[in-house]
């Protein structure tokens, strides 16, 4: 895990514990002795890409630092029904408290990783890389971003703070591409910040405006057809990075990648996923 992710993950785990356990897991407290210990296993019940083991360990140890964790599989492993990802031993009350929290996290992360792998594998022989977006579940973006990387994709910006992305609304409100880019560069200089600038374009003519304003780190082709994307890539001619975005599906992904564009951003990696089926069972 990247060091900068840790505070977000710790905060998410604390929130998950508060919302699920509240003032106590009264079901476990009423029928399981506090000193009783046991062992459980994480059982995979569906084919896919495993993700979230690192987070599961943090959940378990937050609830009981004395948990004994025996890892069998790793994040990024391809799994099938019947595979065991890990065994964990400790106080039964703590194991039962952790069960749903870690399953919710691992099932979603594995779903994102599995979806990403489908997209990434389709163009793995090409130069183009698949990017995620900010279309994530509020509060879970770090986990979604981690899962995308595990599945073979690449991360776009984390949020509004680590890249300037001049999209259509920014450009329109700023009065055009040139004033938007010039304003962005002046702002970064005044603030002493060093973050990349990306600018969305809606036509081939817009590309000329970008370079007339001094250029940016990456140009985003918004809702271009594959043929128009090919022309746009040729027009940029390697002067900056390129990205395709807008309505690109698994069916059209390869056609866009074959244009030579550097990146394709796909919101479906994180907002149209199905959680991977798995369970935590006594053994």
Where are these regions (language model features)?
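Cys/His-rich Zn2+-binding cysteine-cluster or related metal-binding knuckle/ribbon modules and their
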Residues: 250
